[in-house]
Design a protein with these regions (language model features):
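A conserved helix-loop-strand patch within extracytoplasmic ligand-binding domains
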Residues: 113-185
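Ligand-binding pocket segment of bilobal, Venus flytrap-like solute-binding proteins
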Residues: 186-254
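Periplasmic-binding protein-like
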Residues: 129-135, 199-207, 214, 245-277, ...
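Early extracytoplasmic/lumenal segment of secretory-pathway proteins
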Residues: 24-115, 122-125, 235, 364
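Extracellular/periplasmic juxtamembrane helices and adjacent flexible linkers that interface
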Residues: 271-364
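Extracytoplasmic
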Residues: 39-41, 73-75, 83, 87, ...
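Bacterial N-terminal signal peptides that target proteins for export
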Residues: 1-12
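Bacterial N-terminal signal peptides
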Residues: 10-20
Length: 364
């Protein structure tokens, strides 16, 4: 009996203790957890075209990280994607959640606007949303064995030209615009008439000499550096970057060529979803600082700040018949007249396919 009483008391005490512990652990998990430390890191997703990759990775992103740390005490990291401008714009529209779109041409940003992802007026600042300029140039082999100086030099029957595909590369659209505009400029200078037929004619004659079409401007340059082709349509900044890297990459600036204006915009739907609007807005503003514009200039881009452009005027001469997209009617007209299904580019492409003179994609 004595042992029974002892065992009963022990069981009662054990039950009481278990109930006590159960009572202590009955609160919700969030009530038990220690308060979360305040976040000290921001992350931005940058979706850019291929050509400014070095400028961003080596100069601009590290500079902004240091600036943001000093200003806020917070660390900012970047997820980066670099593909052809058109492909990048389509990826963003299809679900790639870039916070910042840094592309080759305005029309690609407009795609993102039409998709409802950019909702603010991205062209409202003093530079109309453009962060860098460049011009279309012709790269050639060392020593210039073909004597290339201008567009007409690319039309000979024995010359092979490289150019990326306008369906995937913003750069290629600039090159098509440059050729059409240059033909019109020549007509205007020689005949006093801005003749679109002359622009189409020059485009056709040069495109007939295109041997390889890559997906992006960067891939096209890589193909050229493998020894394929006699000349390449490229960006001035791409050629200057190669020179900066110690490579022999001579080029000619045609007398009539187009001013390339490269846009940047934050993607409203994504920055709000990710909670990074403040740092994204600050990053876009940072791209217009003098130090950042100098960094772009170092890597071959023409700065949009006038005072920095003056510092680099010897490096970046202005060709005599430089024109902008406005000379061709602006991007809306260009999209309709040149790159739509019934536009000049597709029309020329169909003609070239019919005559079996269309260029082939690069071998991989």
């Amino acid at each position: 009996m004595h042992h029974f009483v002892i065992r009963t008391v022990c069981l009662l005490l054990t039950s009481a203790l278990l109930l006590g512990f159960a009572g202590c652990s009955s609160s919700k998990p969030q009530d038990r957890a220690a308060p979360a430390a305040p976040a000290t890191e921001d992350k931005l997703i940058l979706g850019a075209y291929t050509v400014p990759k070095e400028a961003y990775e080596k100069e601009i992103l590290p500079a902004f990280q240091a600036y943001w740390k000093e200003k806020t005490g917070r660390t900012v990291t970047f997820d980066q994607s670099y593909v052809g401008s058109g492909a990048q714009a389509r990826a963003i529209c299809a679900g790639f959640e870039a916070d910042i779109a840094a592309l080759s041409l305005e029309a690609d940003v407009d795609q993102i606007v039409k998709a409802g992802l950019i909702t603010h007026d991205w062209k409202s600042n003093a530079w109309r949303g453009f962060i860098t300029d460049s011009v279309v140039v012709i790269g050639y082999r060392p020593g210039n064995p073909r004597g290339i100086e201008d567009w007409e030099d690319l039309t000979g029957s024995d010359i092979d030209v490289l150019c990326p595909n306008p369906k995937t590369s913003g750069g290629a659209q600039w090159f098509v615009n440059a050729l059409i505009g240059a033909g019109m400029k020549k007509s205007e200078v020689e005949k006093g008439e801005k003749d679109s037929a002359a622009g189409r004619d020059l485009l056709v004659r040069v495109m007939k000499r295109v041997k390889v079409m890559d997906k992006s401007g960067r891939e096209s340059v890589t193909t050229f550096e493998r020894g394929i082709g006699d000349a390449i349509l490229t960006y001035e900044n791409e050629a200057l970057l190669r020179t900066m890297q110690g490579r022999d990459f001579p080029f000619a600036i045609p007398k009539a060529t187009i001013l390339i204006e490269n846009p940047v915009a934050l993607v409203d739907k994504h920055v709000d979803k990710h909670g990074v609007r403040a740092v994204a807005e600050e990053f876009v503003k940072f791209l217009y600082t003098e130090d950042c514009q100098r960094a772009f200039a170092k890597y071959g881009f023409r700065p949009v700040l006038s005072q920095i452009a003056e510092e680099f005027q010897e490096k970046y001469p202005v060709p005599p018949f430089l024109f902008t997209v406005d000379y061709l009617g602006g991007w809306s007209e260009i999209e309709r007249n040149i790159f739509s299904e019934t536009g000049i580019w597709n029309e020329v492409g169909r003609e070239m396919t019919a005559t079996e003179s269309a260029p082939e994609p690069a071998a991989r």
